[in-house]
Amino acid sequence: MRTLVSRIGLSLFGLTLASSAMAATTVTGQITSSLTLISSCQVNGSGGSTGLNFGALNFGTANSLFTTANGQVLGGGGGALSILCSSGTTPSVKVRAGANDGKSPGGSRALYDGVANYVPYDLYTDAGHSQLLAIDGVITLAASTGVAQTVNIYGQAVGKAGLPAGTYTDTIAVELTF
């Protein structure tokens, strides 16, 4: 009898071990997540690194005998130029050369009619036209807090004798550093 009890006990012990071996096992670990953000800016609501539209300076329509014509650089929405950069950056706008700089006395820049006529003009950082924005002039903005900043750029064209009617244009390069 004792042998029978031992065999039954041994069998039960074996079953217990077998069922323990088949029981689910839990292991633990972790997933590492990451995201790398780089500083960026938007100009008038658009991002990118080349070909951005910094706005348009429209002097309007005047007769060919005008003395001065004033305008302001307007962004895409009709307001002033808008710069939105990552928090912690200090953006600066560099207004580079135009296509016709120095081609007409009376201004550092010039609008061209595509034939042989130029209208001189200059850019300014104030509406009163007292703070000249020279070629390669830099406008440094406040440190960004993630809120769009307004950049005001004004222009004043100067009339001169002998200008024929027509459309006069110029293209100015602009750089945004942040």
Q: Language model features by range: what are they?
A:
Residues 1-11:
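Bacterial N-terminal signal peptides that target proteins for export
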Residues 18-21:
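N-terminal signal peptide c-region/cleavage motif recognized by signal peptidases
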Residues 23-109, 113, 137-178:
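N-terminal small/polar-rich segments of proteins
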Residues 96-98, 122-126:
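Predominantly extracellular/luminal cell-surface or secreted proteins
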Residues 105, 128-135:
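Solvent-exposed adhesion/ligand-recognition segments of exported proteins
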Residues 115, 127-129, 178:
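Solvent-exposed strand-loop boundary residues in beta-sheet-rich modules
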Residues 117-121:
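Contiguous segments within soluble domain cores/interaction surfaces
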